[in-house]
């Protein structure tokens, strides 16, 4: 089994991902979604965590071999990023969603330098907005962001467009298409539910109609 399928299976097994087309979740944006993802759960399962961190290292070495520093997004990317940096013997920093309003007002915590080549770690890509704000924060300090690596992406067109416009490569360990395929093969969803899940990916506002 390849890594993408293996991680998709793990996310389903440990209930980091819930698929509920008949009882949709409501996202913070108000969108009714047949899927809910909480990849923070992966940290509680050592075998799953090791699989994910080794997958991160493999993808970084493959796509971004010249990396100087690993950064995690606050808060979900921090634990994964710290483990990855340790495995790769690289410096680590994390990037807040906004600068602190006290102290020295840092948005990036850790020792970073202009000219460093950074890879940013995120756990989940939905629209891509928050991690691309982290990219901008790093770039504003003269850091070269080589790319973003995440556990999972919903593969929404809005996110793909945002990464293209930002000219930032995105690499994920697994994705929505892989997950729903694995879910169907392993009996987590029915054929009818698979149809709804495919419709959601294409049209988040009208998939239920």
From Swiss-Prot:
Pathway assignment: Pyrimidine metabolism; UMP biosynthesis via de novo pathway; UMP from orotate: step 1/2
Entry keyword Transferase: yes
Binding residue positions for 5-phospho-alpha-D-ribose 1-diphosphate: 96, 100, 102, 122-130
Positions annotated to bind orotate: 126
Top enzyme class: transferase
One Gene Ontology term from the biological process aspect of the record: 'de novo' UMP biosynthetic process
PANTHER family in the record: OROTATE PHOSPHORIBOSYLTRANSFERASE (PTHR19278), URIDINE 5'-MONOPHOSPHATE SYNTHASE (PTHR19278:SF9)
Family listed: Belongs to the purine/pyrimidine phosphoribosyltransferase family. PyrE subfamily.
HAMAP family documented for this protein: PyrE (MF_01208)
Protein name as catalogued: Orotate phosphoribosyltransferase
Organism field: Streptococcus agalactiae serotype V (strain ATCC BAA-611 / 2603 V/R)
């Amino acid at each position: 089994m390849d890594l993408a399928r293996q991680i998709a299976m793990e996310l389903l097994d440990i209930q980091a991902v819930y698929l509920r087309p008949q009882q949709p979740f409501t996202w913070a944006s108000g969108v009714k979604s047949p899927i809910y993802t909480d990849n923070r759960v992966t940290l509680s399962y050592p075998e799953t965590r090791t699989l994910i961190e080794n997958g991160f290292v493999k993808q970084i070495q493959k796509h971004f071999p010249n990396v100087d520093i690993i950064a995690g997004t606050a808060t979900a990317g921090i634990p994964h990023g710290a483990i990855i940096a340790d495995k790769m013997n690289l410096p680590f920093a994390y990037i807040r969603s906004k600068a602190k309003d006290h102290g020295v007002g840092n948005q990036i915590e850790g020792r970073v330098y202009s000219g460093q080549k950074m890879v940013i770690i995120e756990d989940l890509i939905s629209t891509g907005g928050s991690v691309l704000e982290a990219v901008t924060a790093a770039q504003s300090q003269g850091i070269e962001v080589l790319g973003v690596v995440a556990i999972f992406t919903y593969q929404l067109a809005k996110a793909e467009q945002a990464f293209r416009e930002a000219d930032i490569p995105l690499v994920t360990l697994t994705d929505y298409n892989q997950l729903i395929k694995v879910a169907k093969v392993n009996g987590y969803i029915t054929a009818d539910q698979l149809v709804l899940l495919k419709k959601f990916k294409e049209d988040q506002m009208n998939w239920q109609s």
